[in-house]
Regions:
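Conserved N-terminal/central alpha/beta ligand/cofactor-binding core
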Residues: 51, 56-143, 151
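Beta1/beta-strand and adjacent pyrophosphate-binding region of the FAD-binding site
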Residues: 14-29, 47
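A short, basic/flexible loop-to-alpha-helix module at the beginning of a structural domain
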Residues: 3-18, 174
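Cofactor-binding loop segments of dinucleotide-utilizing enzymes, especially the Rossmann-like FAD-
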Residues: 26, 51, 209
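Predominantly flavin-linked oxidoreductase catalytic cores and closely associated redox partners
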Residues: 130-131, 135-235
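Glycine-rich FAD pyrophosphate-binding loop
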Residues: 22, 38-63
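Short glycine/serine/threonine-rich phosphate/pyrophosphate-binding segments
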Residues: 30-33, 187
């Protein structure tokens, strides 16, 4: 018995004879990339596939204030060297042409007033991540980006016609098959992105954590959960 079902939502989003860009991941990079693509190519059909709620991590970043970028280190090469393995991992022309100042200018031009704090972190003047989230969501809607949630790109391959053949899962045993002209994988640290890249023939470097939590059994520290503070830690 074939349990695969053809869904009509994606077909409706892709108009006849229009080129299609599928963005895997509805985080900051995915939504921002989708907006940029739609801005540069208004006739391009842009669809973002996200399993959960778009920009959910943006909403909680920076303690709920959303740390946008760094305002003290504006040179792209220098900035990369301050990230763990950044001098090796940040590659490609995009990082060289779109740095912190470009990011700050974009948000300022779209109504989000920013401030640079003493340590270089850039936050919205509102001190509320919703300013950034609302801006991105509003611009995505204005430009015509389609955000499709509750879906996962289960597999990717190259079709005989040279397009990206994608298998998109909405529910268990409920799939839709789509061919896209372009594919942007912006799934962050999710294993999904690494899996899709490998399926398309890319070689991968095993990921290692740069930001992680400590699991401490001491119940006295439970009340400190979620509290952030500047400190010097020696390991």
């Amino acid at each position: 018995m074939n349990l695969t079902k053809a869904l009509t939502s994606f077909v409706a989003a892709q108009k006849l004879n229009e080129e299609l860009l599928v963005v895997v991941g509805g985080g900051a990079a995915g939504v921002y990339g989708a907006i940029r693509a739609k801005t540069l190519a208004p006739n391009l059909n842009v669809v973002v596939i996200e399993k959960g709620r778009p920009l959910s991590k943006v909403k909680i970043s920076g303690g709920g204030r959303c740390n946008v970028t760094n305002g003290h280190c504006t040179d792209a090469k220098s900035l990369a060297e301050h990230y763990p393995r950044g001098h090796k991992e940040f590659r490609g022309p995009f990082f060289n042409v779109h740095g912190p100042m470009d990011t700050m200018s974009w948000f300022s031009n779209h109504g989000v007033e920013l401030k640079v704090e003493d340590d270089g972190r850039v936050f919205p003047v509102s001190n509320c991540s919703s300013s950034v989230v609302d801006c991105l969501m509003s611009e995505a809607k204005r430009t015509g980006v389609s955000l499709q949630t509750g879906k996962v790109v289960a597999s990717a391959s190259i079709s005989t016609g040279g397009k990206f053949a994608l298998k998109i899962q909405k529910l268990i045993n409920c799939f839709e098959h789509v061919e896209a002209n372009y594919l942007l994988i912006a799934s962050g640290s999710s294993r999904q992105g690494f899996s899709l890249a490998a399926q398309l023939g890319h070689s991968l470097i095993d990921p290692v954590p740069s930001l992680f939590t400590f699991k401490i059994e001491d119940p006295q520290l439970a009340e400190l959960s979620g509290v952030s503070s500047n400190l010097l830690l020696l390991l």
